[in-house]
Curated annotation (Swiss-Prot):
Primary site of residence: membrane
This protein's name: Uncharacterized protein YnaG
Organism of origin: Bacillus subtilis (strain 168)
Listed transmembrane segments: 6-26, 37-57, 68-88
Locations listed in the record: Cell membrane
Length: 91
């Protein structure tokens, strides 16, 4: 596996792992020591996933497009979560 194919795979796995951590945060299935960090992770990891997808766009266009779309969907989630929490709960 060359570097660009690995970048395409990682650009897809980053939002999947972020989504799994967020679902775990909501459901409390497994106890993790990071209180609110799973909600904050997409803000840090999604730009990395988008960059990896752009790097791999010439070798595997389909995976790169999926990576860009999934990371673009996950990126604004923390903003919606924090703004929604402030509007609904006043915190």
């Amino acid at each position: 596996m060359n570097v660009k194919k690995a970048a395409a795979v990682f650009s897809i796995t980053i939002p999947i792992i972020s989504a799994i951590l967020i679902i775990n945060f909501f459901t409390g299935f497994m106890s993790i020591p990071w209180q609110g960090m799973p909600v904050f992770f997409p803000l840090l990891l999604s730009p990395i996933g988008i960059i990896l997808a752009f790097v791999s766009i010439k070798t595997n266009k389909r995976c790169a497009v999926y990576g860009i779309v999934l990371n673009a969907i996950m990126f604004p989630f923390p903003f919606f979560w924090f703004i929604g929490g402030a509007l609904l709960f006043g915190v």
